């Protein structure tokens, strides 16, 4: 049974009912370099606008290892984070 990688993409906007989803499965070649990029939207009630965080992980698959071992290695790799946008403090409304 050959190794394969599955990927699922999702994109949604808070103000619309439109969602874009996609998925892909492929079989990488031995020693192929793969870069995984993820973008996560961070939301907090105190934030006036959402903040996005980008993480990137690069890896080279080694087929003699089991997929479980490879996934464990990926989860242990360090990720790089883009600087967070400055968050302005939100003043609470004055009580009436």
Curated annotation (Swiss-Prot):
Lipid tethering residues (N-myristoyl glycine): 2
Pfam families, A to Z: Gemini_C4
Keyword terms: Host cell membrane, Host membrane, Host-virus interaction, Inhibition of host innate immune response by virus, Lipoprotein, Membrane, Myristate, Suppressor of RNA silencing, Viral immunoevasion
Record's subcellular location: Host cell membrane
Membrane topology: Lipid-anchor
Main location: host cell
Region ranges (Disordered): 77-96
Known role: Pathogenicity determinant. May act as a suppressor of RNA-mediated gene silencing, also known as post-transcriptional gene silencing (PTGS), a mechanism of plant viral defense that limits the accumulation of viral RNAs.
Family to which the UniProt record says this protein belongs: Belongs to the geminiviridae protein AC4/C4 family.
Protein's UniProt name: Protein C4
Origin species: Tomato yellow leaf curl virus (strain Israel) (TYLCV)
């Amino acid at each position: 049974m050959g190794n394969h990688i599955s990927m699922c993409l999702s994109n949604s906007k808070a103000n619309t009912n439109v969602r874009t989803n996609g998925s892909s499965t492929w079989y990488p070649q031995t020693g192929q370099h793969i870069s995984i990029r993820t973008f996560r939207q961070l939301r907090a009630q105190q934030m006036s606008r959402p903040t996005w965080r980008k993480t990137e992980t690069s890896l080279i698959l080694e087929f003699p290892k089991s997929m479980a071992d490879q996934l464990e290695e990926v989860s242990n790799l360090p990720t790089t984070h883009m600087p967070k946008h400055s968050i302005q403090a939100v003043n609470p409304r004055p009580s009436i």
